[in-house]
């Protein structure tokens, strides 16, 4: 969420070299997907079991947590780095590296972990399922992650609209306190750690890490200029790491089963399992945990029952939430669902929220609606975003009608490029990329619509 700009610098295709030698090591995997049930981390994703402490314990949560804590920060960070885990909130930054930024000599200030549960990206609902059905995984993850970075407390910033999810999370935290799992001498480890819940107020911009920090501090949710980065000056002026719900929730399982186990899924630099949301024109919309690098076509057909009307009825897919550029059917045939493959396809994994659009979709109107959302959610702090997104919104409204000239398509492209990379946070990028994807793959549709409007206008003038 609002973190996809950094994805580009961490998702360049890995350089491949081939050496002929007597090496007898096992060849690298070439097929991905079909995750086995015993390898799933989120075992109560659909709420079929008890989400409270008793049920969580029966599913393996809080197992040997004390031993993990006693092994110390360096061991935990080593396992996270070995796992190859990358941030699950959109940026894809290596988690072990990010968490290690907090392990500097103490200057007397406390350190904090902030969990970004402000899930507001259109099409994204993976974190909601964790909060609702597996809250103890997140609470335990806060403890393990906090230990790794020497934090004294975690603040879970949860989207204001998530009333039931916040209630379940509060119950899970209370149960953990009562059982001695968090708080003073957490799990009997001698480590003190508190967990607090902060409710948001429905602002999408607060999904950006520094705007989220501002909101926790009681200020307007507007992004800060960086540097200083949160690892130096974060919440209450103290060193802070902001992490996604899914990223934090998987850390205890990685420590229990080993970083090598986790890195065995997916391609190199794109390892592990991942929660995918599949919505739109599919027969069975769902949230599913699957192996990273699973083919997009397999993901849709196996878990979502396929595209309505069959695969040939597919028009386009937004692969990573509303802020990632769409890809047409021709790309969807072969693309893999991971960071590097989707960057090569000129889009991004983002939050892995797959939005499927069949041939009945008015693709121009769909993208125009997304731009209207970003225009509404812009905080107005940066001129390129405030003025540029408003301008794009007005132009896209005319493109929906066809009331424009083909040359304006190039103008819209140029404006989107002027917004991209010229704002404090990535909301401007998130607004620009859907437009760029539309122009890149559906320019003929735009031109045809404009031509049709011009012909109708001429016919009306001739009739009058």
UniProtKB/Swiss-Prot annotation:
Its main location: mitochondrion. One of its GO terms (molecular function) is metal ion binding. It holds the Pfam family SLBB_2. It catalyses: a ubiquinone + NADH + 5 H(+)(in) = a ubiquinol + NAD(+) + 4 H(+)(out). Keywords: 4Fe-4S, Acetylation, Electron transport, Flavoprotein, FMN, Iron, Iron-sulfur, Membrane, Metal-binding, Methylation, Mitochondrion, Mitochondrion inner membrane, NAD, Oxidoreductase, Respiratory chain, Transit peptide, Translocase, Transport, Ubiquinone. The modification N6-acetyllysine is found at residues 81, 104, 375. FMN binds at residues 199-247. Its cofactor is FMN; [4Fe-4S] cluster. One of its GO terms (biological process) is mitochondrial electron transport, NADH to ubiquinone. Residues 1-20 form a transit peptide. It is found in: Mitochondrion inner membrane. One of its GO terms (cellular component) is mitochondrial inner membrane. The modification N6-succinyllysine is found at residue 81. [4Fe-4S] cluster binds at residues 379, 382, 385, 425. Its EC number is 7.1.1.2. Binds 1 FMN. Binds 1 [4Fe-4S] cluster. PROSITE patterns: COMPLEX1_51K_1, COMPLEX1_51K_2. Core subunit of respiratory chain NADH dehydrogenase (Complex I) which is composed of 45 different subunits. This is a component of the flavoprotein-sulfur (FP) fragment of the enzyme. Interacts with RAB5IF. Core subunit of the mitochondrial membrane respiratory chain NADH dehydrogenase (Complex I) which catalyzes electron transfer from NADH through the respiratory chain, using ubiquinone as an electron acceptor. Part of the peripheral arm of the enzyme, where the electrons from NADH are accepted by flavin mononucleotide (FMN) and then passed along a chain of iron-sulfur clusters by electron tunnelling to the final acceptor ubiquinone. Contains FMN, which is the initial electron acceptor as well as one iron-sulfur cluster. This is NADH dehydrogenase [ubiquinone] flavoprotein 1, mitochondrial.
